[in-house]
Amino acid sequence: MRVKNAVNAKKKRKKIMKAVKGYRGALSRRYRLAKQAYIKAKKHAYVGRKLKKRDYRKLWITRINIAARNEGLKYNELIHGLKISGININRKMLAELAVNDPESFKEYVNIAKQAIGK
């Protein structure tokens, strides 16, 4: 008995070819190359999602550090002071305050200074 799977095979190929529409050259026309390009693109997308988290954290830390140094405190001293005083604010929110609301950020810096005795 022969295997009849034309519908599913066509559906699978169509899905790949639709996904690689817009790729350059043979990558958008030839199935074998298109499949390889699709797999590689998905791999890069996965890695990119992981890198994005790291990049944003780095950006937040840089922003906090710059704002803290303007107030006479280093980044690590600020974070340590906030931890001692029991303030649980994440780096994203702290960076947001540093950029958009410097007065509130200054209050956090003062709390951290008091906690570490500076």
UniProtKB/Swiss-Prot annotation:
GO terms for biological process: ribosomal large subunit assembly; translation. Keywords: Ribonucleoprotein, Ribosomal protein, RNA-binding, rRNA-binding. Gene3D superfamilies: 6.10.160.10, Ribosomal protein L20. GO terms for molecular function: rRNA binding; structural constituent of ribosome. It holds the Pfam family Ribosomal_L20. GO terms for cellular component: ribonucleoprotein complex; ribosome. InterPro entries: Ribosomal_bL20, RIBOSOMAL_L20_CS, Ribosomal_protein_bL20_C. Belongs to the bacterial ribosomal protein bL20 family. Binds directly to 23S ribosomal RNA and is necessary for the in vitro assembly process of the 50S ribosomal subunit. It is not involved in the protein synthesizing functions of that subunit. HAMAP family: Ribosomal_bL20. This is Large ribosomal subunit protein bL20. The gene is rplT.
